[in-house]
């Protein structure tokens, strides 16, 4: 197998973001779709991480660039080829998703750990950004891989997590 000559994109980034919804069917071969679900709260916590001023910008930038690199590499054939040891995967696509999930959960933990940097406004803004991602996914993605009901349930869970953070913040 040789290195791909032409760069191709397997799917759009919003199609990929829709994989964060609860109940999405795990992908094993079709369409190279990565299995990204690592909790509905992660969308909220990722935006809280971004907004939290108690987390140094020098720590945020490389970590968020790594998140972006992972996200792009799931959808790009050349990066996917490199991630799979210079072979195209046979069977389970995007085998590096466990590293991506670990990174996201680590960032989410840091956002919660630095809870003093999560003002009520920032929690509400992070909630709105997370819900905006879901609305964009609903509007612009292929609804065969994720149903409106799954998106709605994910949005309700994010609302619940935001309310828990607001309640915890008040104490």
How should each PLM-predicted stretch be described?
Residues 64-78, 87-171:
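Contiguous transmembrane helix-bundle modules in multi-pass membrane proteins
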Residues 1-62, 69-70, 76-84, 93-98, ...:
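Periplasmic/ER-lumenal interhelical loops and adjacent helix-loop junctions
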